[in-house]
Amino acid sequence: MNPSATPLRWGVLSTAKIGRTTVIPAIQRSEHGTVVAIASRDGEAAHAVADDLGIPQAFSSYEALLAADDIDAVYNPLPNHLHAEWTKKAADAGKHVLCEKPLTLDRTEAAGVIAHCEAAGIVLQEAFMYRFHPQWLRTKQLVDGGRIGELRAVQAWFSYFNDDAANIRNVAEYGGGALMDIGCYPISVARWLFGAEPDDVQAIAHHDPVSGVDILTSAMMRFGTAHATFSVSTRTEPYQRVHVIGTTGRIEVEIPFNAPTDRPTHIFVTAGGSPPADPATEIEEFAIVDQYTLQADAFAMAIRDGRTAALPPSDALANMAVIDAVRTAAGAA
């Protein structure tokens, strides 16, 4: 990408729902990027989405999109088991890659992808959009600034209901399951807030008897003398919440991951001294933003400035290592 005001030209691999409904519109609203192409193995589907979203080019193969010389970067929302293959192929084509989470199926595969992209000289980032939302930047600022004292615990719940056997999230060989799809979020949050990797991981999981994917996974990560705990499920009432607890206060993040784009978000900060006899709770409100747009602009700026992405590949590798550890601790294959 020419280090100028020229927008980053994006190509999108597949007509996946997350791209159609969320990420593509967000990039189209961004300051530093534009979507110029979309590809699908179903050419009619690619053209239909392109027409619907106003995308100039539609390709009937991923290879054709990667061969186009007017594309700077690729957004990869393919099923998890295809992340590694097509991220590498995009790198070989000289395209920067924003890859949906989790980056790969395991740490070993992630290490190979990262090395491949480094050798190709392209910018690679795992798409954890929540990290760009002001509510999380503020939460991190409060924790690092000592507003709640010493960080002692992070607790998270994230769930939705999906029992469609044909859905990729319920297919084991595609990298489906609650841990891979949404467990990666609380793991990422805990590592980021503690600024460290866990010393120990314990976990339990319940698996669907037919598909074999985990449908309820709970884990505890030890960070020195502090703990992070989470439960994720794909077969319970949709809900998400994160509690960040310190020695002299706590923070509750109301909608931590799927922050809405149609209303403000809030965090609840309770800090009443040590010990807090009757602490007051302050509600901090954040203006309406699209965290996917913020992510796209940050990625484009990193490429323009010739620097590593805001979430470097090393972070994706470390997160994948913890996912592996949770799987192992829960007794999964």
Language model features with spans:
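Beta-strand-loop-alpha-helix segment that lines the small-molecule cofactor/substrate pocket
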Residues: A73, P79-N80, A84-R131, G146
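Short, conserved SAM-binding/catalytic segment
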Residues: V49-I55, V113-C117
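NAD(P)-dinucleotide binding in Rossmann-like oxidoreductases
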Residues: H207, S211, F223-Q295, P312
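Short, Asp-centered acidic motifs that coordinate Mg2+ and/or phosphate
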Residues: A37, Q57, D72-A73, A153
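Predominantly a Rossmann-like dinucleotide-binding segment in NAD(P)-dependent oxidoreductases
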Residues: Y130-P209, H227, A333
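N-terminal Rossmann-like dinucleotide-binding module
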Residues: M1-L53, A332
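Conserved SAM-binding strand-loop segment of SAM-dependent methyltransferases
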Residues: I55-Y62
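C-terminal helix-rich "cap/oligomerization" subdomain common to oxidoreductases
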Residues: M1-P7, A73-Y75, A298-A333
